[in-house]
């Protein structure tokens, strides 16, 4: 079975952790493009429930682009979010989780940090950002960005 990753999946799983502090520098344009293309090509999970994912990332010199997407202070200097929306089909949460984790592992392979956010974000603002329709919900989002060089208190919360 071929994978879209440059490293074995098991290695990426071991490498990935919940990154809560990021550099203020936005994700580079090339990595944004690669991640957006991967997201566009991997929208479903193994059970086929409809899910949608998108990258919302700040451009160079435009850190304010993500202002107002509330994460209650758990994440420092996020320069991007992986947004996801899903309908109300059977096995939808399984498909959502599978697809989101595959995207997260790709981001890890690009050298980016990520952190799942399930209950510590303002769902209505993220739903608006991904244009979720009335039958869709946003169960989780993931912060993404360049990993901060110096780990602080938030980072010490990771297992």
Question: What annotation goes with each model-predicted range?
Answer:
Residues 1-159:
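Acidic, surface-exposed loops and disordered segments
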């Amino acid at each position: 079975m071929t994978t879209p990753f440059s490293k074995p999946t098991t290695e990426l799983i071991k490498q990935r952790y919940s990154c809560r502090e990021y550099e203020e520098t936005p994700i580079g344009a090339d990595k944004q493009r690669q991640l957006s293309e991967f997201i566009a090509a991997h929208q479903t999970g193994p059970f086929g429930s409809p899910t949608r994912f998108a990258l919302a990332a700040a451009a160079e010199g435009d850190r304010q682009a993500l202002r107002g997407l509330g994460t209650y202070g758990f994440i420092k200097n996020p320069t991007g979010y992986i947004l996801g929306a899903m309908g109300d089909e059977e096995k939808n949460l399984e498909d959502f989780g599978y697809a989101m984790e595959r995207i997260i592992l790709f981001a890890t392979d690009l050298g980016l940090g990520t952190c799942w956010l399930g209950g510590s974000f303002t769902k209505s603002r993220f739903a608006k950002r991904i244009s979720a329709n009335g039958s869709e919900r946003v169960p989780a989002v993931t912060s993404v960005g360049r990993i901060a060089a110096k780990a602080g208190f938030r980072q010490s919360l990771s297992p």
